[in-house]
Amino acid sequence: MALWGGRFSQAADQRFKQFNDSLRFDYRLAEQDIIGSVAWSKALVTVGVLTTAEQQQLEQALSVLLEEVQADPQAILASDAEDIHSWVETKLIDKVGDLGKKLHTGRSRNDQVATDLKLWCKFQITELKTAVQQLQQALVITAEANQDAVMPGYTHLQRAQPVTFAHWCLAYAEMLARDESRLQDTLKRLDVSPLGSGALAGTAYAIDREQLAGWLGFASATRNSLDSVSDRDHVLELLSDASIGMVHLSRFAEDLIFFNSGEAAFVDLSDRVTSGSSLMPQKKNPDALELIRGKCGRVQGALTGMMMTLKGLPLAYNKDMQEDKEGLFDALDTWLDCLHMAALVLDGIQVKRPRCKEAAEQGYANATELADYLVAKGVPFREAHHIVGEAVVEAIRQGKALEALSLSDLQKFSAVIGDDVYPILALQSCLDKRVAKGGVSPQQVASAIAEAKARLF
């Protein structure tokens, strides 16, 4: 039975009911709805609506219902209830009779669903933070094992300067640390309870909403009832967090797809995260990474869709806001799955050090070192930059690396170049010189790994 039938003389058209009902997705809020109902029953005791004995009876029945939901949440979907609130109330009445009809006193589905969703978001943030931390840990472990794996760093997808695979791993660990920080910031803002705001104007019962918030584990209660039932900022923020996080994972996936390609051949991916071709027997496709990259779009779409849903809504609650859940649920599920999959990819990755080093030695990745060498000899940097560009052209013409050019060849471009240039152009020297904080020198990379381990393990 609908919770609002008294006003109507005709039953809802079945097609409208199917269009209007939300149980098929908001059943995921069942645990939160029950937890909120227990807290609300306690609040009703404080204002004389329920006796202590009645509240205890309701709480016991709700606790049994919670256990049933936890044992088989999918069983909820067999009901034709309009939404999860209707389902919980109906089940409660089945257990305790008319006493269950008293529970909704002073409460609206507007503040009820806002509370349920915030409680769900709080739990989900905890899950996501754990997954983000686990992926950071996987990156740090991989970095520690590959500190000596020299490879080319890229700009414009052109070889630029030598780095290490460890330094690459730590770059993504930094991105994930920001993702974790964003989740924590989102939690701070959503950690206020809307329960007790009623439909829009507040409840007529003198309930201590701060006490109620504390029972639910919120830091405080909201300050304005209109805003409380209208606010979906936390949905937007979480979708934004997920969108940014998925951009990071998509870039991670793209890098590894390239590193795994036959053209780069820097890494081998585990058989556990790759698949084959139905036609070409030689293929080993990076499907896990391609799916991570592909799923980024659906998460961005959820954020855009939610922003468009909210942008024209007047205060307070509107049915449009029922559209807040499916996109949020899917986006956060997707992000969580991709975080786990990215960690699995790293678990079995093999870095091909000889090939990485070979690539780093090509493409004139040490050209900047020659420019810095000239600067140290008193040549202005802009002039040094031009000189090295000419030297690179000559090296390309001869089909040689910069360090393979003879001293006489190099001195054609600048007389200040001496024999001491050759150690400077060595690959390891290029790394060793990057000693400033955040650089790719072995000392800085080791320090960054130590800092990350202290934070994460």
UniProtKB/Swiss-Prot annotation:
PANTHER family membership: ARGININOSUCCINATE LYASE
Keyword Lyase: yes
GO cellular component: cytosol
GO molecular function: argininosuccinate lyase activity
EC number: 4.3.2.1
The keyword Lyase appears for this protein: yes
Protein known as: Argininosuccinate lyase
Enzyme class: lyase
Subcellular location(s) of the protein: Cytoplasm
Family matches, as Pfam families: ASL_C2, Lyase_1
HAMAP family: Arg_succ_lyase
InterPro entries, alphabetized: Arg_succ_lyase_C, Argininosuccinate_lyase, Fumarase/histidase_N, Fumarate_lyase_CS, Fumarate_lyase_fam, Fumarate_lyase_N, L-Aspartase-like
